Every structure is written in structure tokens, then in C-alpha cells.
Amino acid sequence: MANYQNASNRNSSNKLVAPGAQAAIDQMKFEIASEFGVNLGPDATARANGSVGGEITKRLVQLAEQNLGGKY
């Protein structure tokens, strides 16, 4: 698991806005992968990895909406 995380961090061009958020994002990624029965890594299919990424996005949007709580 750690090797995959390190490789993904090196290849990512996305910059996190909140310091320390990488650990939380990685934890969310592996929890969702576990829920979906996906083994993340270089041998996983793009469809399997994409399903995890899509679910991360969905959950992050839900969290943001809850935090905004009708402020906008």
C-alpha cells in the first residue's frame, strides 16, 4: 500500500489546498476501494480505479454541501 501511495504522489499534478489533507484523501481512497472490493495499484483496471475516484468526488461534494449548509 505505501509504495502505491508514494508513486501516486509523485505522479500527481494536483496540489492540495489544505496542508495535511493528503493523509485524509489517501485514507478515504483506500476505504472506498475496500468497500468496492477494488485492489488499487498498477494492475487495477482503469474502470476500477475510476469508480473509486468518482466516489471520492461524490463524497467530497457531499461534505462541502454539508459544510456550506445553505450559506450560498
From Swiss-Prot:
PROSITE patterns: SASP_1 (PS00304), SASP_2 (PS00684)
InterPro entries: SASP_alpha/beta-type, SASP_alpha/beta-type_CS, SASP_DNA-binding, SASP_sf_alpha/beta
Pfam families in the cross-refs: SASP
DNA-binding keyword on record: yes
Annotated GO biological process: DNA topological change; sporulation resulting in formation of a cellular spore
Site for Cleavage, residues: E31, I32
Record key words, sorted: DNA-binding, Sporulation
GO molecular function, one term: double-stranded DNA binding
Residue stretches spanning the membrane: none
Similarity comment: family membership: Belongs to the alpha/beta-type SASP family.
Function recorded in the entry: SASP are bound to spore DNA. They are double-stranded DNA-binding proteins that cause DNA to change to an a-like conformation. They protect the DNA backbone from chemical and enzymatic cleavage and are thus involved in dormant spore's high resistance to UV light.
PANTHER family reported in the protein's UniProt record: SMALL, ACID-SOLUBLE SPORE PROTEIN A
Note: SASP are degraded in the first minutes of spore germination and provide amino acids for both new protein synthesis and metabolism.
Name of the protein in its database record: Small, acid-soluble spore protein C
